[in-house]
Structure formats: C-alpha cells, structure tokens
Amino acid sequence: MEQAPGKVKSEGENLMGLPRDCGLELHHKWKSGKLNKITDVNGIKVANVTIQDNEINTGVTAILPHEGNVFKSKLVAGASVLNGFGKSLGIVQLKELGNIETPIIMTNTLSVGEAATALTKYCLEQNEDIGVTTGTVNPLVTECNDGMLNDIRGLHVKEEHVREALKLAEESGTDFDKLAQVAETIKNA
C-alpha cells in the first residue's frame, strides 16, 4: 500500500483517521467544518455502541440527521455506493425518492437485518400512522464487513444495541464528553 505524501509510517503505527491528519491533502471547493466531522453540520447527532469481548469487535452507529421526527420531516438525500455488494438496506428507495425518512444506522454486514428490525420498531413507536394512514417506513441501514476483526458469524449485534445507540444520539448528540456519561447512566439504569 502506498503511503500518504508527507507522512512516513513507522512500525506498528496506524494511519487511520481523518485524511488530512494522515498527510493526505484533498482539494475541493468547500471549506471543512470546524472539526472536519459530520457533527459540524447543525442538528446532526451521532452516537455509537461498541461490543467487545475476546473475538468480538463490532458495534452500531446511529446518525440522527435532525432533531425532529425524520419520518414526518424527510430530508433530501442521495447515495453513491463504492465497493458495495447491495447488502445495505434502504438505498434503492433513497435513490428513487431522493429522501431519507429514518435515522441512519451503520453496523456490520450480517447485522443489517437485526438493525433494520430495531430501527423499524423505533419508527413505528414514534409514528402510529405508519402503515395505517401513510405508507410504510424505509429503514436506512448501511454496513461494513468487519469479519477480519470480529466473530461476524456470532451475530452479536442485537436490537438493544441499536436502541442504545439511538438513545445515546438523542441524549448526547455531538457532545462527545457527555456521550460517555450518558452511556454509563444508561448501562446502570
């Protein structure tokens, strides 16, 4: 693998992180946000739940695109898939209609179904009209194959992990110092 210009990798050093922190200069016409993170966009909240134990290294990330009810206040969106094999859920409708109507969940490849079920239940609880006076909901779940790092066959991501990530995002949002405190409170509840 070729190294990023201006950065020499030493033995055991990990160059993952933000591209510019690794010496990679990306040229574009837009200015980066203050922290160069998704949470620089006003209203976006993000939280994750990590599951680790021996060979288990996986988790769930929840992205709330705004503070309101996403099903009732849909957002214009698009998708571009790179190196994808069609295992994410909700992308086809997103491309067809050009909007998202749920929070976005990211998890491992074999946990997409579990995450979609949890996200659908979350949306049904918030919107009693889904499937009654409106259409159904399009849960948006993306994935990454973490099988090299994780016992992916163990199907360790459960509905409660998705629920916890959503709750953490709602309660802490972009305040990552507060995120750890909220996570501890939820675990002890």
Task: Describe the residue ranges of each PLM region.
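Alpha/propeptide regions of enzymes that mature by internal proteolysis
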Residues: 12-189
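N-terminal cationic leader/targeting segments used for protein routing and processing
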Residues: 8-10
